[in-house]
Amino acid sequence: MKKLSVIMLALLMSIGAMAGEKDEYFTLNSGFLFNNTLNATFGYERELNYGNAVELFGEVGNQWQRDPVCGKVCNESFWKGYYWDGGLLYKHSLKKFKNGNFRLRIGPQFGAHTGDYFFAVEGGFEYNYVFRSGIQFSLIQKNQVSFLHGDSFRNGLLIGLKIPF
């Protein structure tokens, strides 16, 4: 019996367990990007070991400009700068807090901007605060460099929620 309890204790000590490991979330973020861009992002996130995570996401946005005819942003000109894309992000944990974490986000994106296809690379930072219910509040600083079309650089802030399931 003593031998069995020593083996069980050694087995329990060798198995690593972390809070939040393998959790899954539905993410929803929105915000403004430079230059005159409104952005909304939705996705699926899976937590990995040591606070790292992977996110598969899609986003839609609109870059508005002044209409040369009416001299301001009009209904006719507002929706002409739309884009959509999707991608995969790896989120490396830089710092863990009691109820939150700070991560580096990096990954590729593919999509279309007013009919022209593009490839992009996204990088940035993310801070998450975890509420008692498991829902997370996110503050995201985003930098996106796009290739193969004129709108080559976007950066800005997004806020959002992560809902566990």
Predicted regions and their residues:
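Short loop/turn motifs that connect adjacent beta-strands in outer-membrane beta-barrel proteins
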Residues: 19-23, 50-51, 94-102, 115, ...
